[in-house]
């Protein structure tokens, strides 16, 4: 096989491969949204179920700078309950991803002692959230549906 022919064949195979990856993007973005939303929503529900313990944890364990423990508990819990719903719907998806990224970052910063495995989980979640914020939540979203109708996207 000559060099130009080899280059053409390689380029054609690469184009097919990237076409498959492009076709998988909507499903991958949705899977990331559903996974992240579940993690944070369940965390918010746990905080809501035992509010006194949540406030105690924010008083003793989670040292959120500049906020009272009550305010930090309320804001963190509200973010963990509202933003995942937006993320699942893909409504204001980038805003929701950025908001959860901040919640995730504050959780890491606020913990005085975090186990390496827990830190690794937070880095993974942060990476997924950063990807959704940077690249968008994908075409299987209300943001995409609204944009196709000429309305502002999230």
Regions found by a protein language model. Name each.
Residues 55-67:
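Perimembrane loop-to-helix junctions flanking transmembrane segments
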Residues 1-49, 66-78, 82, 89-154:
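Extended, low-polarity transmembrane helix blocks
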